[in-house]
Amino acid sequence: MANLNQIQKEVSEILSDQKSMKADIKAILELLGSQNPIKESLETVAAKIVNDLTKLINDCPCNKEILEALGNQPKEQLIGQPKEKGKGLNLGKYSYPNYGVGNEELGSSGNPKALTWPFKAPAGWPNQY
């Protein structure tokens, strides 16, 4: 079991370490404050990357071949536009026997017991609407 003297020594060591770390942190913060802001350095690096990529693209022989091919293409389009627009789907009235429905826009089902909307309550039912 640790006695009070050992505990006091360990606490004093931890306190001295903490003070030295505090001084180190202040020194690091001062060093960072004296340098250029991060945003400016990132913009500089990004500009260099863009310039390098632009130079690589301009110097690439395949790029020159593409530009020559585009320069030699005919001025008129090789594939003409369609003269008539394609007809859309012909969606006529629903002609399949639609028993169980009775909406006029779907056509008549011929079923006398077909449901209609708005719903009409049968005789004897309380009026809900």
From Swiss-Prot:
Transmembrane segments: none annotated. Residues 1-31, 38-59 form a coiled coil. It comes from the Viruses. Gene3D superfamilies: 6.10.250.630. It is found in: Virion; Host cell junction, Host plasmodesma. GO terms for molecular function: DNA binding. InterPro entries: Caulimo_virion-assoc. Keywords: Coiled coil, Disulfide bond, Host cell junction, Virion. GO terms for cellular component: host cell plasmodesma; virion component. The keyword Disulfide bond applies. Residues 122-129 are annotated as: Capsid binding. Pfam families: Cauli_DNA-bind. Belongs to the caulimovirus ORF III family. Homotetramer, through coiled-coil domain. Homotrimer when interacts with icosehadral capsid. Interacts with capsid protein, and with Movement protein. Plays a role in virus cell-to-cell and plant-to-plant transmission. Interacts with virion icosahedral capsid and movement protein, thereby facilitating virion cell-to-cell transmission through plasmodesmata opened by viral movement protein. Also interacts with aphid transmission factor, attaching the virion to aphid stylet when the animal feeds on an virus infected plant. Aphid saliva may later detach the virion, inducing release of infectious particles when the animal feeds on a new plant. This is Virion-associated protein.
